[in-house]
């Protein structure tokens, strides 16, 4: 098929994302723009849009495109990761719809998300983190939940207002592991996660003893409803107070204030 790329990209954007994945128009527009940028890049390196074939999209070429975004367009690491997420999604789709070049698809899907140089939660030291989770009783359902909330906040630098909306579908459970975080203005960013943390998420979901759907919120309250910002703030403050009693020199800054 001479125009295999345009054919499958059109099906991906107009059929697969809205009908099978249930993505909203804002997310689809973001994905579409990612491919507009890719096509413009390919034009710059001598491949016109109407001539692009799937075989042209190699791992090396995708990596060059991502570096171009960061170095030539001055895109942030977060934006770079968002473009890569769109590309990953397309090649996951191709694995089943057009598996002719599946070995190359696998290489592209193994391109990792790039880690930011600094963590936003720099005010929470490793020592404070260890002390904080050390006072949590993980033997009960809600203690285990609180433990996972604090681990996720430290691992991803997610804010409370973003954390309460996290769903299972937001995690990528295959390499490269990541979480999609939706922030203010419905802006999305993709944050890399460690394999160890992904394993903890899977263990946590299994511990719930009820079938969670991909679209369900990961963290819920006693009524099985989504946690509120105030609810998470209460959880954080509770453990900080306990940890402070044992370690008065730690937690000089207000954790909750920084994470809202």
Spell out what each predicted region is.
Residues 1-260:
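Conserved catalytic core of the tyrosine transesterase superfamily
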